[in-house]
Amino acid sequence: MGIPVEVLTKFIGQKVKDVYGRDAGVIVHVYTEIDGTITGIELFKGEEIKTYSPNSVKVDGDSVVILPDWKTDSLKVLGQMEKIRKRQRALEELYSRQEIPKSTYEDMKRKLDSELLKIRDEHSRLKGRLKDRLNSIEDQVAQIDRAMIALKINYISGEIPELAYKNSMEILRLSRDSYALERDDIKKTLDKLDGLDKEVIELKPSASLNTSTEQSNKNEGNKSEVSVPIPVRVINTL
């Protein structure tokens, strides 16, 4: 169930953060349908206005947090792949127990395979996006580390006062920590995507039905191997 519009509209005009503690902007508008269904949330940050989907917004206690686009899309793909996996297992189980005919099995298998193909295409593109974001984060962390080192040098050399040094270091530390949280989250998400993809199984014909077919073929083969009497011709030599 989505967030009730009455709850979200209370945060209009307020600053919100993302799930990693960074400023995401100010909620300036909530788009809704006549029935109250939320269709989008508009945030203003700096000089930019961005519209987020309802799935990108989560109420956390007395505050609202924003999910990055990659996380929203990852949750969607993971959910779809999990559903496909469960349906595959259910179909295979029914077929192995001979509770559905082969024609129904093959028809449903084709549909599942078609859906799986689409999801795997999206899965592949998503992994590419996550890896790109991971590289971007690594660059940001490296830049923050360089800034922290330069700041320490300037402080130790007496070029900046202690208060300015502490304030700047705290800002850099919080920024680095938030990037580290996102980096770890992306790595875990990539692991989940890889793991679930391996669990999505290729359906195979029932073992019991295979055994029956093999037994039938074996019986047919045995029939062909039954010994046939060799005709004997007796020649009278008297």
Swiss-Prot record:
Induction: Induced around the genome segregation and cell division stages. Down-regulated after UV irradiation, indicating division inhibition in response to DNA damage. InterPro entries: CdvA_CC, Cell_Div_Membrane-Interact. Keywords: Cell cycle, Cell division, Cell membrane, Cytoplasm, Membrane. Changing V232D: Loss of interaction with CdvB. Its main location: cytoplasm. One of its GO terms (biological process) is cell division. Pfam families: CdvA. It comes from the Archaea. It is found in: Cytoplasm, Nucleoid; Cell membrane. It is a peripheral membrane protein. GO terms for cellular component: cytoplasm; nucleoid; plasma membrane. The keyword Ion transport does not apply. The keyword DNA repair does not apply. Part of a cell division machinery. The CdvA, CdvB and CdvC proteins polymerize between segregating nucleoids and persist throughout cell division, forming a successively smaller structure during constriction. CdvA is a membrane interacting protein that recruits ESCRT-III homologs to the membrane. Interacts with CdvB. The C-terminal 18 residues mediate the interaction with the wH-like region of CdvB. This is Cell division protein A. It comes from Sulfolobus acidocaldarius (strain ATCC 33909 / DSM 639 / JCM 8929 / NBRC 15157 / NCIMB 11770). The gene is cdvA.
